[in-house]
């Protein structure tokens, strides 16, 4: 086995391996096996305690099962994989492995016959995937989203009143502030974050076609519907009482749809920041030993935002197939979801790489105030909007077309605007307000909106 990232086929385990180390404990083959071993043994504990099974359940049994979970190792995982080569069935191999382990510490105990009792493979697998997604959301995804929002808000609050020329259709438009334009993204992200946190992660354990057939036939006096609910919810999951052989994966589609929406918002963010860097509204702090180009020594490229955009695109491309394919299964089940589900870690890995790049890029940004003011002062034509609005307020007709003729497609200076304002027949106080107006201070509520958002935001 070649362990070096140099020989990895995927850049996830190669070039970017250091960025996704934490995911290996959730989505690797080893982790998947450990989750399934844990679920098998927790189910074994659950049913062996039922009085209908008449199992002698003592401290030795409990300690044996707990030790198998707590001490699960790479050696154990490899043993399961060796068994799988013979059986060509991953979950049956886990069952044989557990029977062997339990026999070693308890001998020929009655509990051996209850390993994987009344289960179908999907009873174990769906719960494993549910836990994997639950843990990744709690420990990996949400903390990174919070960090991105925090970094965006930090820059926004620091520059809440720094004026910036807006651009609609790529052309000069009504000014905003650096802070307000960043807060737009923070608001969008927070909204998705709230939805993501509230997505119910479901699980089921109800047999080969979702009807408890084997369980009910063997022990009809047991309320298996209730036992199923108790077991699933004990794992910190929501119970799905109505399924075929498989949990239908609707929640996984919801989970990744929300992830894709966040990724799409961040692609938008990356492109906007890339553009602002190109306009020199932001500068990037150079690192002494870094090189921007193999031939152009002066270059400081927006590589973090470009890297993030590319990896978010890869993640969303796979998500597109996940959310379309997973909720569809032929009749009571087909196996086409199995290979797709094995790629959920890949999806999240590409996203994590992208999130790290955004955070790195944000920490390098410096607002270039002088360039922002220079751009604003080059576009006095944007004041046509407030001037014509005030004129309309006082019933002056055809103001829009009059200002259109003066400003549209022309280089407009402060002198042209001031001369026009002085010619207006409006109250003196209104004229004074217009004469004091500049592209730099025509900001509406931009700065205030940043503070309002910060005060109402749940993420501090």
UniProtKB/Swiss-Prot annotation:
Principal EC category: lyase
Signal peptide per UniProt: none
GO molecular-function term, one example from the UniProt record: N6-(1,2-dicarboxyethyl)AMP AMP-lyase (fumarate-forming) activity
Keyword terms: Lyase, Purine biosynthesis
Active site: 169 (proton donor/acceptor), 293 (proton donor/acceptor)
Catalytic reaction list: N(6)-(1,2-dicarboxyethyl)-AMP = fumarate + AMP; (2S)-2-[5-amino-1-(5-phospho-beta-D-ribosyl)imidazole-4-carboxamido]succinate = 5-amino-1-(5-phospho-beta-D-ribosyl)imidazole-4-carboxamide + fumarate
Pathways per UniProt: Purine metabolism; AMP biosynthesis via de novo pathway; AMP from IMP: step 2/2; Purine metabolism; IMP biosynthesis via de novo pathway; 5-amino-1-(5-phospho-D-ribosyl)imidazole-4-carboxamide from 5-amino-1-(5-phospho-D-ribosyl)imidazole-4-carboxylate: step 2/2
InterPro entries: Fumarase/histidase_N, Fumarate_lyase_CS, Fumarate_lyase_fam, Fumarate_lyase_N, L-Aspartase-like, Pur_lyase, PurB_bact, PurB_C
Enzyme Commission number(s): 4.3.2.2
Family stated for the protein in its record: Belongs to the lyase 1 family. Adenylosuccinate lyase subfamily.
Self-association state and partner proteins as the record states: Homotetramer. Residues from neighboring subunits contribute catalytic and substrate-binding residues to each active site.
PANTHER family, per the entry: ADENYLOSUCCINATE LYASE
Name of the molecule in the record: Adenylosuccinate lyase
């Amino acid at each position: 086995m070649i362990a070096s990232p140099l020989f990895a086929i995927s850049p996830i385990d190669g070039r970017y391996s250091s960025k996704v180390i934490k995911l290996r404990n959730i989505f690797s083959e080893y982790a998947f096996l450990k989750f399934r071993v844990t679920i098998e043994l927790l189910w074994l504990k659950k049913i062996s305690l039922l009085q209908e099974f008449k199992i002698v359940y003592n401290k030795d049994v409990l300690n044996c099962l707990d030790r198998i979970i707590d001490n699960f190792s790479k050696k154990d995982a490899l043993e399961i994989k060796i068994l799988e080569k013979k059986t060509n069935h991953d979950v049956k191999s886990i069952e044989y492995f557990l029977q062997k382990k339990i026999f070693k510490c308890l001998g020929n105990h009655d509990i051996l016959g209850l390993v994987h009792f009344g289960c179908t493979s999907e009873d174990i697998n769906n719960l494993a995937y549910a836990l994997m997604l639950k843990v990744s959301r709690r420990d990996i995804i949400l903390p990174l989203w919070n960090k991105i929002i925090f970094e965006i808000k930090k820059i926004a609050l620091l520059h809440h009143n720094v004026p910036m020329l807006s651009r609609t259709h790529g052309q000069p438009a009504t000014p905003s502030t650096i802070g307000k334009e960043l807060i737009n993204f923070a608001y969008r992200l927070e909204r998705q974050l709230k939805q993501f946190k509230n997505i119910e992660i479901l699980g089921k354990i109800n047999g080969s076609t979702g009807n408890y057939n084997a369980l009910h036939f063997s022990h009809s006096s047991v309320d298996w519907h209730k036992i199923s609910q108790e077991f699933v919810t004990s794992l910190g999951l929501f119970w799905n009482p109505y399924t075929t052989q498989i949990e239908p994966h609707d929640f996984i589609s919801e989970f990744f749809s929300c992830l894709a929406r966040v990724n799409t918002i961040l692609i938008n963010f990356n492109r906007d920041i890339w553009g602002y860097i190109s306009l020199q509204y932001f500068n990037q702090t150079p690192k002494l030993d870094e090189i921007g180009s193999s031939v152009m020594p002066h270059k400081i490229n927006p590589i973090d935002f470009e890297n993030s955009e590319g990896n978010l695109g890869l993640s969303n491309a796979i998500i597109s197939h996940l959310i379309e394919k997973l909720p569809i299964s032929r009749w009571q089940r087909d196996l086409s979801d199995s290979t797709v589900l094995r790629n959920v870690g890949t999806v999240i890995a590409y996203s994590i790489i992208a999130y790290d790049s955004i955070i790195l890029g944000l920490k390098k940004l410096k607002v270039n105030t002088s360039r922002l003011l220079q751009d604003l002062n080059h576009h006095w034509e944007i004041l046509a909007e407030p001037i014509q609005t005030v004129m309309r307020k006082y019933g002056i007709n055809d103001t829009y077309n009059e200002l259109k003729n003066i400003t549209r497609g022309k280089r407009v200076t402060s002198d042209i605007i001031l001369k026009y304002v002085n010619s207006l027949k409006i109250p003196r106080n209104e004229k004074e307000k217009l004469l004091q107006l500049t592209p730099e201070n025509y900001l509406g509520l931009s700065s205030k909106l940043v503070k309002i958002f910060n005060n109402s935001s749940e993420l501090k």
